Amino acid sequence: MAKITGNLVATGLKFSIVTARFNDFINDKLLSGAVDTLVRHGAVESDIDTVWVPGAFEIPLVAKKMAESGKYDAVICLGTVIRGSTTHYDYVCNEVAKGIGAVALQTGVPIMFGVLTTESIEQAIERAGTKAGNKGAECALGAIEMVNVLKAL
């Protein structure tokens, strides 16, 4: 039985990171974690392009454009949606998740979902580099692994 796995070596790979500007005090930390992880695993900063969009809802469109460009081995999507007192949270979270998943399936490029969907600011802070780790860094690891898994197939 063959066991196909992806390694965590980013040498020679190119990445795009699409980050929402809304809640940027959290998203800056997610972005820093992602870039740091990519570099620690062999990517060079000149092979990492970052694009800022107004909010999480706009991420899938830009991720699709980046994936279709053929310039990137993977696209990492970062943002934070914090529940408020209206149903807006539910609509945004659902559409962003569907949109990012659709882009991956349509393009065949790994598109990583690093959009925090939290009940509170405290939960978001925990996931951006404190006691729950940095989800931007985790997405970067996932991107590296997925690129290498797809290359091994």
Curated annotation (Swiss-Prot):
Q: Name one GO biological process term.
A: riboflavin biosynthetic process
Which Pfam families would you find in this protein's record? DMRL_synthase
Named in its record, the pathway it takes part in is: Cofactor biosynthesis; riboflavin biosynthesis; riboflavin from 2-hydroxy-3-oxobutyl phosphate and 5-amino-6-(D-ribitylamino)uracil: step 1/2
* Sample GO molecular function, one term: 6,7-dimethyl-8-ribityllumazine synthase activity
Q: Which residues form the active site?
A: H88 (proton donor)
Q: Which residues bind 5-amino-6-(D-ribitylamino)uracil?
A: F22, A56, F57, E58, T80, V81, I82, F113
* InterPro entries named in the record: LS, LS/RS, LS/RS_sf
Q: Which reaction does it catalyse?
A: (2S)-2-hydroxy-3-oxobutyl phosphate + 5-amino-6-(D-ribitylamino)uracil = 6,7-dimethyl-8-(1-D-ribityl)lumazine + phosphate + 2 H2O + H(+)
On the tree of life, the source organism's domain of life is Bacteria
Q: Report one GO cellular component.
A: cytosol
Q: Record-annotated residues binding (2S)-2-hydroxy-3-oxobutyl phosphate? A: S85, T86, R127
Q: What is its EC number?
A: 2.5.1.78
Q: Which UniProt keywords apply?
A: Riboflavin biosynthesis, Transferase
Q: What does this protein do?
A: Catalyzes the formation of 6,7-dimethyl-8-ribityllumazine by condensation of 5-amino-6-(D-ribitylamino)uracil with 3,4-dihydroxy-2-butanone 4-phosphate. This is the penultimate step in the biosynthesis of riboflavin.
Quaternary structure and interacting proteins, as annotated: Forms an icosahedral capsid composed of 60 subunits, arranged as a dodecamer of pentamers.
Give the record's family classification: Belongs to the DMRL synthase family.
Please give the name of this protein: 6,7-dimethyl-8-ribityllumazine synthase
Q: Which organism is it from?
A: Haemophilus ducreyi (strain 35000HP / ATCC 700724)
What gene name is listed for this protein? ribH
